[in-house]
Amino acid sequence: MLDIKFVRENAEIVKENIKKKFQDKKLPLVDEVIALDEERRAAIARADELRANRNKISKEIGALMAQGKKEEGMALKEQVTAQAKELEELAKKEGELGEKVTQIMMSIPNIIDDSVPIGKDDSENVEVQKYGEPVVPDYEIPYHTDIMETFDGIDMEAAGRVAGNGFYYLMGDIARLHSAVISYARDFMIDRGFTYVVPPFMIRSNVVTGVMSFEEMDAMMYKIEGEDLYLIGTSEHSMIGKFIDTITPEEQLPLTLTSYSPCFRKEKGAHGIEERGVYRIHQFEKQEMVVVCKPEDSRYWFDQLWKNTVDLFRTLDIPVRTLECCSGDLADLKVKSVDVEAWSPRQKKYFEVGSCSNLTDAQARRLKIRIKGENGNYLAHTLNNTVVAPPRMLIAFLENNLNEDGSVNIPEALRMYMGGKDKIVPKK
C-alpha cells in the first residue's frame, strides 16, 4: 500500500504506474482518494481549531469565575458545549473518511521497479537465467500421477471420497520422497544462515489484509466459520504477520527466516489437463523463505532469495529457468517478482515451481512493521520466496529422474533422507 502523502504529491506518477499494469479502470480512484483525503484533512484541521479554541475558552471561564463574573462564564460554557458536539461529529466524519481512504488505497497498486518489463500478462514475462540442459529422453515419460501409481504411491480416488476434488493420499516411497524434499530444503536454508520456524497455520483478518489484496484474499483464502481466522495460503502470511506492530533495531537486521507449513487454497478448477493430478490442489506443503530488512538492502536480498531456489534445484540436477514477471503479471503489492520454472521432459516445456517477490514497504505500512534507526523509526522492507513446494517439485523430480524401466534415481543430496537409497523401484 502506498503512502497517501505520496499519492497526493505524485498523482501523475501513480496514474502512469496503473497504466503500466494495464489496470486503467482504477485510474479514477487516484483523484477520488485525493479528494476524500482533502476532506478528511479539512475535518482534522477544523477539529484542531476547535480544540485550541476550547482550551482558550476554558482558561477564560476560569478567570471569569474567579472574578465573580458567573453569567459571562456560563455563556462561554455554552460555547464549549456546542463545540463539543461539533467535535464529536467531526471525529465521526474523520473516521468514516479515513476508512474510505484506506479501502481505496488498498486497491491502488504499488509502484513497480524501473527494471520491470512492461507487459499485459505472464505470456510477456522475460527469461533472465537458465541452468541445466533440458533433456527429452527417447522413452515415454508418463503423467506424474501414473508414475506415482506404479509405486502404489498415490490415491486420489480415496481422497476424493474423504475430502472431494483437489486432495490426495501419498504413500510409501512417494510419501517418503515428499518428506525428504521438504527436510532437505529446510536443512539447505538453515545451512545458508536462515532461522527455521514453524508458524501458525491460521491467521486473523487484519493480518490477511496486511499481506495481500482483497482480490487475492477472496480467490485464495478459506475462512473458519464463526471465527476471525483464515487458513494460510502460504507461510509467508503468518511469518510476515509475526512482526505486526513491532519496531526492530537496525542492528538486528536483516531477519532471515525459513518456514515450513501446510498451505490451503481455494484455487482449483478448469485449468486444463496439465493441471489435473497434484499440480493445482487445495492442500499442499511448502518450505518458504522470508526476509525483513532495511530499504537499501531489499534489492540485494531479492536476488539472493531466488538464487537460493535455483541453487537447490541445481543440487538435484533439475534444469530450471528464472522469468522476470512483467508489469501486468505483478500482484498489486509487489514491486518486483520472478518465477522459477522447472523443466518437464514429458511436456517438453518449463512449468512454475516457485516465485520470489519484493514488496518493499507495502506490507510493512499495512502491518506497521518498523525499524528503529538513529534518526527515528521508519518502515521495513519485506520479501518472500518459495524454497520448494511439493508436490509440484515431485512432478519435476520424478520426470527428470525417471529411468526407462520405471525406477527413479535418488540424487546424493536426498539419500540421507531416503534411508540411503540411490533408487526407488516401482511395485507395478
Describe the residue ranges of each PLM region.
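N-terminal alpha-helical targeting/anchoring segments
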Residues: 1-134, 149, 153
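TRNA-recognition modules of translation machinery and tRNA-sensing kinases, especially anticodon-binding
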Residues: 27, 130-428
